Amino acid sequence: MSNESNAIHTIQFSGSGVFNPDVLDATHKQLDAVEADSSIEAVFLRGEGKNFSQGLDLEFLMANPDIFSEFVTSTMHLAARFLTFPVPVVSLVNGHAFGLGAMLVLASDYAVMRGDRGFFCLPEIDIGM
């Protein structure tokens, strides 16, 4: 899920890039490591295959409705952390960016998106979130 090259730390979202509590925790741990390493000058976010991120893991949320509110709040904390991160964050949007994935792109300092494929979408209102 991560790779360091010189002064750049890359966070790569696996598969469709859906966010569940484990992915959120892993992302926070990577950000903690970057903040602790003064040699890191930038963070790159990237997806895999045709997806940057499909957003929240809706299957997980449907199976765990009791933690819905807490989980959504924790995703907002992650987006806020990217907004205020001490080194530049660059989103390399290789494909679809939905929901939280799209919000992380918006919270980045810079974003580059392929022009030939991928959708950028915030579907929360359409699905009643």
Predicted feature descriptions by range:
Residues 1-48:
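Conserved CoA-thioester-binding segment of acyl-CoA-metabolizing enzymes
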Residues 16, 50, 117-119:
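A short, glycine- and basic residue-enriched loop/turn
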Residues 39, 46-81:
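Glycine- (often His-adjacent) and acidic-residue-rich active-site loop
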Residues 78, 98-129:
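CoA-thioester-processing core
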Residues 84-91:
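Short beta-strand/loop segments at the ligand-binding rim of alpha/beta enzyme cores
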Residues 92-98:
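Glycine-rich beta-to-alpha transition loops that act as phosphate-gripper elements at the mouths
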